[in-house]
């Protein structure tokens, strides 16, 4: 069987490519595929405990079986076909990956409606320092199709947990200068508490499960800012929500 393989972030640098196509024996699993590359790239093998895998844009375990024409992505820790129900549940919401500058004052008005009593806007911006050094700029990359799917999943879960009206979620890719906006989340609701709580849930969950990575550039070089890996159950239960 043939499998398409994708690498991101630091893993892409280790193997020297972003994409590959390999032929595997029937019955092969994710761990077999990773071992194949690990044998060729010993540095990659040493990162096994820190690598996540996705099969056809869904997080998968090492023992997950592979099938012909599967797309397998090996992912460093995140900085961070679509479900039909998610599409219908988020028909009023906006989730997008963009490359142009994000201007909060221009896009936040999209979530306002006459029935709303509150709009909360979270804006993540590029700061001028990290790791005790001056930051020159950042570069973001993403597993785009999967990132959009996970963003929509977050919107669906937000509606399950909180009484909110509209959601807008944007993340920018490419080179960002100091002070520019990397992510914007806007939430409207009849009441402020729900809008605040939903916004906090959205950014915290986004940082854990959406496959987007940033590379920090300094005067003496660049590093990938790896965050935490997604967990098996990314969303809190109803009892844990406020």
Segments (PLM) and residue ranges:
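N-terminal, polar/charged subdomain of small-to-medium soluble alpha/beta proteins
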Residues: 4-6, 14, 71-77, 83-182, ...
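Ubiquitin-like/PB1-type beta-grasp interaction modules and other compact soluble beta-rich domains
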Residues: 1-89
């Amino acid at each position: 069987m043939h499998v398409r393989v994708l690498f991101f972030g630091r893993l892409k640098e280790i193997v020297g490519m972003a994409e590959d196509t390999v032929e595997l024996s029937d019955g092969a699993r994710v761990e077999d595929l990773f071992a194949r590359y690990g044998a060729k790239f010993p540095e990659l093998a040493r990162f096994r405990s820190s690598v996540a895998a996705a099969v056809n844009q869904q997080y998968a375990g090492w023992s997950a079986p592979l099938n012909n024409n599967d797309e397998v992505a090996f992912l460093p820790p995140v900085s961070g076909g679509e479900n039909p129900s998610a599409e219908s549940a988020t028909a009023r919401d906006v989730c997008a990956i963009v490359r142009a500058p994000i201007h909060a004052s221009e896009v936040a008005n999209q979530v306002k409606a006459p029935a709303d009593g509150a709009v909360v806007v979270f804006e993540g911006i590029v700061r001028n320092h990290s790791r005790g050094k001056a930051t020159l700029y950042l570069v973001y990359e993403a597993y785009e199709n999967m990132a959009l799917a996970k963003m929509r999943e977050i919107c669906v879960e937000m509606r399950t947990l909180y009484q909110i009206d509209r959601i807008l979620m944007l993340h920018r890719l490419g080179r960002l200068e100091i002070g520019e906006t990397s992510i914007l989340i806007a939430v409207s609701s009849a009441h402020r508490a729900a809008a605040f709580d939903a916004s906090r849930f959205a950014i915290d969950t986004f940082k854990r499960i959406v496959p987007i990575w940033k590379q920090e550039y300094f005067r003496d070089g660049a590093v990938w800012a790896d965050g935490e890996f997604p967990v098996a159950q990314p969303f809190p239960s109803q009892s844990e929500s406020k």
